[in-house]
């Protein structure tokens, strides 16, 4: 469970995060939506202890990320390509992630089989450094890196960016299948309302760092209210 209480962050006069209370329950697939500048990425960086809040707190399974490293073993995240070690090939990078997580190379190779369709023959076995991959294939490497350890909490910022239509559709299945198989909590931001509604069990709408809506999304029930909000 993730608990956010009175979390605040400003950059100068700009309010980037002002969340009084938000609880993300175990097993939620939470879609985070909002226009540019809504504070989605700022919230993710606060969750991952990449930014220090001006006030308030974040607890991941009752651990404050600013005070302990223990939460890192249970969280997988990909925000942008700055997370990647781009002078490695994808295989070298995944092997490194496996090693620091206590996985054997056999276990890493077995996990990678789950992503063969998503990789579409463009990531594995190409003998290319990550830095030389296309934006879409870097995105695939980042997403796989967040999932390969099978963490119980996954945070992905705009995962559908840079992906072609086929890869976007496959990714939706990858994420929903992962959630079903592991019971993990997924937190995903996206500008694509359709993809968000398709895969999320709950949708949170942010504007100027504030939670405007927190909608259950059974059978895409949040779609109409979200469309009405963004069309106003």
Predicted regions and their residues:
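The feature captures the beta-strand-to-loop junction immediately N-terminal to the Walker
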Residues: 33-35
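Conserved ABC transporter NBD signature motif
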Residues: 56-71
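Catalytic Walker B motif of ABC-type/P-loop ATPase nucleotide-binding domains
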Residues: 154-158
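H-loop/switch region of ABC-family ATPase nucleotide-binding domains
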Residues: 189-191
